[in-house]
Amino acid sequence: MHEWGLSEELKIQTKQMIEIAEKELSIMRNAIDKEDECILCKMEDIHHMLANVQTLAATYYIQAYLSPYTESSSFITTAIQHLSARKHGALIVVERNETLEALIQTGTTLNAHLTAPLLESIFYPGNPLHDGAVLVKNNHIVSAANILPLTKSTEVDPELGTRHRAAIGLSEKSDALILVVSEETGRTSFALNGILYTISL
């Protein structure tokens, strides 16, 4: 049985952020009756605060989602940190309970022991393997330059790039966890069960 509870430090941070959001909601509720007050700015502030709460929680849960399926989760997160800092785009699929062979168009077979430097080198711009997805199973990189199914959901942000659409697409069809690094912003996220979560590593 997995332990999904938040750490004590994260509980405190999350509660503090929620309390601030509650105060802002109260201020906004009172401002509705005032003709000289605009609540749109307040709504944007609250949206930003709640997004930060989600990012905080998602960052914690990523380890809980990964650790039962690979002992190399720390190598994966280290690689993600470095790739993000350099704005090197990346797409990493972690196979969990369901096999992915029927869903992925296999690229180049590697069957290599997973290390952070190897992951980083695969996604180095110009590397022939960097455009597709890496498939991780247990503690091994099974293959690279894999092609994933793209989401067809009309609810997905139209500004999302191919990597993010591929991550969501595979997560809609399997229990895999897919990590993404944006090459435009360096922002990191993961897709699970058809939902994309922003994380800060």
Swiss-Prot record:
Q: Changing residue 4 to K: reported impact?
A: Nearly complete loss of c-di-AMP synthesis
Q: Report the catalytic activity.
A: 2 ATP = 3',3'-c-di-AMP + 2 diphosphate
An example molecular function term from Gene Ontology annotations = ATP binding
Question: What keywords are annotated for this sequence in UniProt?
Answer: ATP-binding, Nucleotide-binding, Nucleotidyltransferase, Sporulation, Transferase
Asked whether the UniProt record includes ATP-binding among its keywords, one would answer yes
Q: Explain the induction of this protein.
A: First expressed at onset of sporulation, maximal transcription at 18 hours during sporulation in mid-stationary phase. Under control of sigma-H factor; in B.subtilis is under control of the sigma-G factor.
GO BP terms, alphabetized: cAMP biosynthetic process; sporulation resulting in formation of a cellular spore
Lineage: superkingdom: Bacteria
InterPro entries attached to this UniProt entry:
C-di-AMP_synthase (IPR014046), CdaS (IPR034693), CdaS_N (IPR019457), DAC_CdaS-like (IPR053472), DisA (IPR050338), DNA_integrity_DisA_N_sf (IPR036888), DNA_integrity_scan_DisA_N (IPR003390)
Report if keyword ATP-binding is assigned: yes
- NCBIfam families assigned to the protein according to its UniProt record, in alphabetical order: c-di-AMP_CdaS
Q: What is known of its domains?
A: The N-terminal region (residues 1-69) is required for activity, unlike the B.subtilis ortholog where their removal increases c-di-AMP production.
Protein family according to the UniProt entry = Belongs to the adenylate cyclase family. DacB/CdaS subfamily.
Record HAMAP family: DacB (MF_00838)
Oligomer status and interactors: Probably forms a homohexamer.
The identity of this protein, by name, is Diadenylate cyclase CdaS
Give the organism, scientific name.
Bacillus thuringiensis (strain BMB171)
